[in-house]
Amino acid sequence: MEKFTVHTGVVAPLDRENVDTDAIIPKQFLKSIKRTGFGPNAFDEWRYLDHGEPGQDNSKRPLNPDFVLNQPRYQGASVLLARKNFGCGSSREHAPWALQQYGFRAIIAPSFADIFFNNCYKNGLLPIVLTEQQVDHLFNETVAFNGFQLTIDLDAQVVRAGDGREYPFEIAAFRKYCLLNGFDDIGLTLRHADKIRQFEAERLVKQPWLNTKLVG
């Protein structure tokens, strides 16, 4: 998992409340057995004018010019600004995969759905909770200034705007540690690989019958 330390990026404002996971990545794209390739289908039903299906050449599909992520000023955005209860609906880890593979490193909103919130951390996507008043101000700034950027300093736990304003945010110490070091669940386990191998070697000596293959 990629480390998250300090990130500066263009902000894209998604001015909708209760954005659910089916809007983030529609159900037909969940058939894939891979963890990659979801970025082109993030917000598929809002992003394109036709119906999307797995395996399509998305470069040939008609774009919805009214959708915020299709507007030229937000191309290359890596910080998503959203409204309350972002990521609600059914549990699907594909949702943070799609957002991350689109190019987002962080999402700022007044609140998130719990399962989506946890899935973001497990996949290196930083969900930041700010107050509704702070989010309102950032929406106004993002719309008013072309190429509006924010800098997110995870170690300092602060979002910095170009006008000098700072927005502190809370994050659990363990989650912060994992993001700063790029540890997902597998990465955390592999830190103890030597001890795991030692345990398995000792177990094989002490309990050899556990490795006996059953015949018949």
UniProtKB/Swiss-Prot annotation:
Tagged with keyword Chloroplast: no
Keyword annotations of the record: Amino-acid biosynthesis, Branched-chain amino acid biosynthesis, Leucine biosynthesis, Lyase
Annotated metabolic or biological route of this protein: Amino-acid biosynthesis; L-leucine biosynthesis; L-leucine from 3-methyl-2-oxobutanoate: step 2/4
The reaction(s) this protein catalyses: (2R,3S)-3-isopropylmalate = (2S)-2-isopropylmalate
Biological-process GO terms, alphabetical: L-leucine biosynthetic process
Coiled-coil segments: none
Keyword Amino-acid biosynthesis found: yes
HAMAP family (UniProt xref): LeuD_type1 (MF_01031)
Name by which UniProt lists this protein: 3-isopropylmalate dehydratase small subunit
Protein's gene: leuD
